[in-house]
Each structure stands twice: as structure tokens, then as C-alpha cells.
């Protein structure tokens, strides 16, 4: 069973074992508007928490998406190259950005649960 976390940078994380799926929240995609391009990290990229890992570009602006944890990218959502609008349509499911391994599970303890994230976006 997966557990979901959120960051103050408006990312969601779904944790299953040692693999974390990362995406931007529905709130974030609403703020950005229609996405037109997404630049994802490459498989095998080693990320440190806080690294700019991806870029989401909308008709309004381009925004960095930051690595929420230390780890290595093991899969990217290749469908987004042809269909970046998946993030607008299904940000917290089919619009995921990348999957990564977790190096330090204690970093999860510093993330937000759903209630804390809802309070943040209030």
C-alpha cells in the first residue's frame, strides 16, 4: 500500500517500498495554467533534496520542480513528452513526473501529510 506525502513546493509523493513517484499537485497545476512543455530528468540521474530536477512550462511561466528527497531517478513519465496536458488533467495520478529510489527514508518524516498540505494552501 502506498503512502502519500506533500511538499511546501506543491509536489506530491507516493511511496511504495523504496520507490517514490513524484508529481506536482492539482493546486500547482491550477496556478500554472495550461502546460505546454515538461523537461524531465534522465533515468539514472542522482538527485539531492532541493535540486531543480524538472521544469514545467505553461502559457504563463516556466517553473522548476525540485527533488523532494535524495535518490536516483529510475523512471520518467514518457507520455508527458507528447501530452504535457496530462498534468493539467490528472496531476495527482497519470500526470506523475518521475519515479526515484529513496536513499534516506528519514527525509520522509519532514514532509507534509494531506491535512497539513491542505492547511498550507488554505
Curated annotation (Swiss-Prot):
This is Glycine cleavage system H protein. Residues 19-101 form the Lipoyl-binding domain. One of its GO terms (biological process) is glycine decarboxylation via glycine cleavage system. Its cofactor is (R)-lipoate. Gene3D superfamilies: 2.40.50.100. GO terms for cellular component: cytosol; glycine cleavage complex. The keyword Lyase does not apply. Belongs to the GcvH family. The glycine cleavage system is composed of four proteins: P, T, L and H. Keywords: Lipoyl. The modification N6-lipoyllysine is found at residue 60. The gene is gcvH. The glycine cleavage system catalyzes the degradation of glycine. The H protein shuttles the methylamine group of glycine from the P protein to the T protein. Binds 1 lipoyl cofactor covalently. InterPro entries: 2-oxoA_DH_lipoyl-BS (IPR003016), Biotin_lipoyl (IPR000089), GCV_H (IPR002930), GCV_H/Fam206 (IPR033753), GCV_H_sub (IPR017453), Single_hybrid_motif (IPR011053).
